[in-house]
Amino acid sequence: MKVRASVKKLCRNCKVVKRQGVVRVICSDPKHKQRQG
């Protein structure tokens, strides 16, 4: 899980979702998991 000011899709499997006001990236590749913080 990477915590970043700006989250971006890193590959075509990445999806940007908003959960409880937090922007997250979910992906089949665990290295691509991110959240905004």
Curated annotation (Swiss-Prot):
GO terms for cellular component: cytoplasm; ribonucleoprotein complex; ribosome. The keyword Iron does not apply. InterPro entries: Ribosomal_bL36, Ribosomal_bL36_sp. Keywords: Ribonucleoprotein, Ribosomal protein. The keyword Membrane does not apply. GO terms for molecular function: structural constituent of ribosome. GO terms for biological process: translation. Pfam families: Ribosomal_L36. PANTHER family: 50S RIBOSOMAL PROTEIN L36, CHLOROPLASTIC, LARGE RIBOSOMAL SUBUNIT PROTEIN BL36C. Belongs to the bacterial ribosomal protein bL36 family. NCBIfam families: rpmJ_bact. This is Large ribosomal subunit protein bL36A.
